[in-house]
């Protein structure tokens, strides 16, 4: 009896420690981050970065369409926006919701260092995101950040890169395109949406590079799927992609046929954001990996896609 009681107390202590560690999400990771191509060769590299739980204030909430809002946030304590990599994401606590218990994973859309702002592009997909797009200026949000591994930089021999985004998959492409342009790459975007009204942040993308557009109804750009856009007839040396799974698989197949390096940002359903709940597992050549921790960005050669 005494031994059983001791074991129970020990189990309770271990459970409490594990739960506390998970809630704080303080996990030391080696993140792959962009370093300059025409400066320091390599990939995004920030060593020993810790995930943080930090309050951010909503500085503006711009409704871009019926389904999307752009939140621009600043650290509540006046500090600088934490270093992040294009392709990473944050977990946002949803305020004022009695039924949304889990944080919501949102891609980092852009980091404006001049204004010290972190941008999040939010698509209404359920009760949690409905609360987020309705937030007023001045509201405080609790974020866990930065999460996941972002995009890598192309080899020094690469000059022309294509960034393809469909639907909410355009979100990480703005930040990635901006970072690549700073490092001397020729950046172009291929953006797809159901209609003209669903095309997001076009003016921001046009500041960075050439923009090719496809809409399902032909209301803007080329009529049809992004995977049929004439931009794919041009010569590209690196492809980045994020969007619906059929689109990403089609773009991956295009890249393989043309011997182009390709990275995709997966949108598997997530919960914890730190690899604990195992609900975002993807089958890869290395076995089952948690997208939130080992991704969301993967080179297509690592994925067991039938393409």
Task: Spell out what each predicted region is.
Residues 5-8, 12, 16, 41:
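Short hydrophobic alpha-helical segments enriched in small aliphatic residues
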Residues 50-139:
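Ferredoxin-reductase
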């Amino acid at each position: 009896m005494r031994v059983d009681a001791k074991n129970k107390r020990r189990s309770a202590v271990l459970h409490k420690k594990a739960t506390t560690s998970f809630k704080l999400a303080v996990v030391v990771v080696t993140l792959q981050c962009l370093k300059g191509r025409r400066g320091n060769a390599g990939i995004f590299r920030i060593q020993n970065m810790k995930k943080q739980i930090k309050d951010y204030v909503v500085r503006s909430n711009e409704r871009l369409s019926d389904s999307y809002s752009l939140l621009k946030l600043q650290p509540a304590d006046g500090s600088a926006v934490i270093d992040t990599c294009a392709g990473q994401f944050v977990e946002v606590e949803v305020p004022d919701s009695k039924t949304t218990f889990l944080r919501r994973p949102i891609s980092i859309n852009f980091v404006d260092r001049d204004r010290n702002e972190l941008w999040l592009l939010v698509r209404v997909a359920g009760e949690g995101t409905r609360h987020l797009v309705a937030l007023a200026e001045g509201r405080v949000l609790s974020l866990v950040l930065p999460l996941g591994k972002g995009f890598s930089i192309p080899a020094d021999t690469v000059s022309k890169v294509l960034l393809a985004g469909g639907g909410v998959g355009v979100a990480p492409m703005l930040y990635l395109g901006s970072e690549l342009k700073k490092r001397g790459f020729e950046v172009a975007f291929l953006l797809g949406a159901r209609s003209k009204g669903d095309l997001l942040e076009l003016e921001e993308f046009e500041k960075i590079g050439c923009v090719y557009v496809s809409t399902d109804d032909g209301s803007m750009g080329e009529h049809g799927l992004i995977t049929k856009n004439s931009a794919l007839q041009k010569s590209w040396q690196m492809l980045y992609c994020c969007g619906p799974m059929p689109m990403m698989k089609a773009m991956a197949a295009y890249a393989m046929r043309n011997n182009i390096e390709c990275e995709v940002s997966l949108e598997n359903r997530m919960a914890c954001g730190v690899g604990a709940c195992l609900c975002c597992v993807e089958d890869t050549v290395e076995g089952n990996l948690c997208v939130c921790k080992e991704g969301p960005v993967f080179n297509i050669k690592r994925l067991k896609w039938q393409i």
